UniProtKB/Swiss-Prot annotation:
Pfam families: Gate, Nucleos_tra2_C, Nucleos_tra2_N. The chain crosses the membrane at residues 1-21, 32-52, 89-109, 182-202, 261-281, 285-305, 344-364, 384-404. The gene is yutK. Its main location: membrane. This is Uncharacterized transporter YutK. The keyword RNA-binding does not apply. Keywords: Cell membrane, Membrane, Transmembrane, Transmembrane helix, Transport. GO terms for biological process: nucleoside transmembrane transport. It is found in: Cell membrane. It is a multi-pass membrane protein. It comes from Bacillus subtilis (strain 168).
Length: 404
């Protein structure tokens, strides 16, 4: 039943993308079918097949060790301030982890390890799905770094991207999350193995929906075998790389903290207004979260959430789209134990992406800053990219639900 439900959800999600496709006759069936099969195969290996699941759980435990190492530095700095009552203080336990992992990724970048990983995964995706090297490389980079950093690896080529490539790169960025913030989600109570699996599944999903909604109609500039990745200015040495990474991580952590503070407070204001307004008509308990739940509950049901849990699941999906994934994860993490394992898995996958309305401004600032001549294209494609990124996350969630 789970497999049939998941397949029906996957077909429905792909059908939605097909409806929004600009050039249906130009859709490459190979990209869609192979991309979908890649996601299903990966989901089966890490969630259902005992040997594959054991290996992935081992890998997840190694990643969890990195979080423990990060906590050593956090404890040294904050000591007894780390806890407020019985719960760790968010600003002192979650945000500093982002700083540590940003520094770690910067060191791996300096040692050329990340570039090698990008090339291997990107090359594999390009051969499997028949996508260009540029967009495949960007999709691979998005597994580990965020939508702001991944375009840097293809910086010299952005201005000359085809419209389809530009859209696909935008979609890939929105369907994934940054490696540094991923570990922040884990500290909110989201199982690390689900977050890692969702990040890897986002790569083929982003390519599939990018090519479904805006198929390629032009000749790409990166069909040549001598395509080279941009590696940036780099750091003087490992210490310099770690320092620069920590500084970048601090900026991200401060932005996340400020954003959460503002959004949580604004939600409280909105809920106060809604409660007062609807209270005049005798309606109690009307909140932004409950409204989003009613709007998005059919989508939650479509991807495999049982109907009795769909209202709350839909609320988190709506929060992720309208606000952002960190707000949704922080609320979901507080109640994850109240859901069935299947629903908790589906929600964990569905929220794992940057596809929200505020990300359009981020894309304009990053991609538009790297290629000012494409800013108008990015602005026009923004809403469609959010749709494509959201559908990519929902597809991963539907597939994950098949194997729980």
């Amino acid at each position: 039943m789970n497999v049939l439900w998941g397949l029906l959800g996957a077909v429905a999600i792909i059908a939605i993308a097909f409806l929004f496709s600009e050039k249906k006759s130009n859709i490459k069936i190979r990209t869609v079918i192979v991309g979908l099969c890649t996601q299903v195969a990966f989901g089966y290996i890490v969630l259902k097949w005992e040997a594959g699941r054991a290996v992935f759980l081992w890998f997840s435990s190694r990643v969890q060790l990195l979080i423990d190492y990060a906590n050593e530095g956090i404890s040294f700095i904050f000591g007894p301030l780390l806890k407020v009552g019985d719960s760790p203080a968010f600003a002192l336990s979650v945000l500093p982890v982002i700083i540590f992992f940003s520094a770690l990724i910067a060191v791996l970048y300096h040692l050329k390890i990340m570039q090698l990983v990008f090339r291997v995964i990107g090359g594999g995706l390009s051969k499997l799905l028949g996508t260009s090297k540029t967009e495949s490389l960007a999709a691979a980079a998005n597994i580990f770094v965020g939508q702001s950093e991944s375009p840097l690896v293809i910086k010299p080529l952005i201005a000359g991207l085809t419209r389809s490539e530009l859209f696909t790169i935008m979609t890939s960025g929105l369907s994934a999350v940054a490696g540094s913030t991923l570990f922040g989600y884990a500290l909110l109570g989201i199982p690390i193995e689900y977050l890692l699996a969702a990040s890897f599944m986002a790569a083929p999903a982003g390519l599939v929906f990018g090519k479904l909604i805006i198929p390629e109609t032009e000749k790409t500039q990166t069909v040549k075998s001598d395509f080279k990745m941009d590696e940036g200015e780099g750091a003087a040495n490992v210490i310099d790389a770690a320092a620069k990474g920590a500084s970048t991580g601090l900026q991200i952590a401060l932005n996340v903290g400020a954003m959460l503070l503002a959004f949580v407070a604004l939600i409280a204001v909105v809920n106060g207004i809604l409660g007062g307004a609807f209270g005049l008509f005798g309606l109690k308990g009307v909140t932004l979260e409950s409204i989003l739940g009613y709007v998005f509950s059919p989508i939650a049901f479509l991807i495999g959430v049982p109907w009795h849990e769909a209202l709350q699941a839909g609320s988190y999906i709506g929060q992720k789209l309208v606000l952002n994934e960190f707000v949704a994860y922080s609320n979901f993490g507080s109640h994850i134990g109240e859901f069935s394992k299947k629903t908790a898995t589906i929600i964990s996958f569905a929220l794992c992406g940057f596809a929200n309305f505020s990300s359009i401004a981020i894309m304009l600032g990053t991609l538009g800053g790297l290629a000012p001549s494409r800013r108008s294209d990015i602005a026009r494609l923004g809403l469609k990219a959010v749709l494509a990124g959201t559908l990519a996350n929902l597809l991963s969630a539907a597939i994950a639900g098949m194997f729980i």
